[in-house]
Amino acid sequence: MSSQNMLSSLPGRTQSPVNLPRGAHPGAVLLSPKGSSANLQALGTNPTSPSQQPLFLNDLLNQQQFSLDSQLHLRDDLGRPSNMVSPLSNSAMNPTASNGSTFLDTFSRPTSSMAINHQPLPLQHSNSNANVMVNFTNDVNQLCNWISMLTPSQQNTVMDNLLSSLNEEVLHSTKLKLDSLVHSGYISPQLGPIASPIPNKVQSQVHQAENPQPLNLDSVLNGDNIYRQWSPLPQNTASPMQQPMYDYLADIPRPRSADPYNAFKKGGLSSGNANNNSNNGNAISNLNSSNPFGTNTVSSTNMSNSNSSSSATGRKNMNQNQHQNQYLNRPQSPTNIKANVFNKTSLATSSSNSGNALTTVNSASSTTSNFNCTNNSMNAKGLCDPKLLKNVPAWLKSLRLHKYSEALGSKPWFELIYLDDEALENMGVSALGARRKLLKAFSIVREYKANDMIDSSAF
């Protein structure tokens, strides 16, 4: 009977932790409210009484914490690729996780033991500081080893994330250290890789858009998003034209010097120079053949006159070529076709007259060639305008010689055109170029007046 009473006083098998399934945690019954209260009632113990306390409670909680930590480590190791190593463990990242059973232990501890545990507080504080320093040193060493195992692109990503979270003073001191290392020659600046292959990140970006998760160091490096969030998306490198080293194959804008209009214009200038040289040779040969018995003085004078006339003719031909190029390249309207045809015929006539003038030696032909040259360069029609002839300052302004208006504006135009070089110099026209320009304009107006081509309203 006594043995039966003892067996009846023991708790049933439904309340025993031995009856739990094999995969359950060992402290599940103790942590559950029903199971823990039933066990305590069956055992007849008070959780707060110091006389009776379960000695195996701390062991079970420690085993539970150890199993949780091991499962978390296994999950991290299975979800992480083989070449990626986590720099910090879960216990290091969460130092308070190991003290998760502190709250439960308070119910099973006697008050005397709690008082004894509170007495050596400075010693525990110093031990905790030492443990924190050791843990910090270990974490730093693990972080350095982990960074050394990364690829350059992954190291760049880590540095981008670190720099954005550092303090301004730390960034400044880091910059000073880098500058000192570079200037001392310990670290030499290196150029980035050229045409390095960039992996395609389209699938990873779609996956991240479907499953948004909070970013941390492990998720950034374990996933495919190894680029900064604010950086532009990498381009697909299927074609070699997108690489920097193939930039020389890209289309380059055509320079203005290779334009056909400029080439044609330069060709016109070269043809004008060629005409000038050929005209000089023709003039000299014609002079030598027409005056075989002349003296040296007369021949030299004629040669100088012919050289001046031929140079003027060369300038005239160059101007003609430029005008022709402008007329050819200018878009023409139906109203301007007749004017262009008239100008072309007049240019052809003047060029033929200049060619005829080069074949003769007398002074009349040289005067005609000079007249044709100045006629084209000074716009004879504008010089013989009656309104300009009446207003001598305006006439001088059309020649860009308006600064001599005070010296020459007092004389009428029909007296002014008969002045020579010496008279102009005496009147205050000291520049040789200005006097030559005025003499050419005077000769044009005199020619028009002799042919009665000036309107009578100008007198």
UniProtKB/Swiss-Prot annotation:
Residue ranges with Polar residues bias: 1-18, 314-336
One annotated GO biological process: nuclear-transcribed mRNA poly(A) tail shortening
SMART domains (UniProt xref): SAM
Transmembrane residue ranges: none
Ranges where the SAM domain occurs: 387-448
Organism domain of life: Eukaryota
Segments of this protein annotated with the region Disordered: 1-33, 259-336
Alphabetical list of InterPro entries matching this protein: SAM, SAM/pointed_sf, SMAUG/VTS1_RNA-bind, VTS1_SAM
Annotated Gene3D superfamilies: Transcription Factor, Ets-1 (1.10.150.50)
Keywords associated with the record: Cytoplasm, Nucleotide-binding, Protein transport, RNA-binding, Transport
Localization terms from the record: Cytoplasm, Cytosol; Cytoplasm, P-body
Skewed-composition ranges (Low complexity): 267-313
GO molecular function: mRNA binding; nucleotide binding
Annotated PANTHER family: PROTEIN SMAUG, STERILE ALPHA MOTIF DOMAIN CONTAINING PROTEIN 4-RELATED
Subunit structure, interactors included: Monomer. Binds to RNA.
Function: RNA-binding protein involved in post-transcriptional regulation through transcript degradation.
Family membership noted in the UniProt record: Belongs to the VTS1 family.
Name this protein carries in UniProt: RNA-binding protein VTS1
Species of provenance: Kluyveromyces lactis (strain ATCC 8585 / CBS 2359 / DSM 70799 / NBRC 1267 / NRRL Y-1140 / WM37) (Yeast)
Taxonomic lineage from the root: Eukaryota, Fungi, Dikarya, Ascomycota, Saccharomycotina
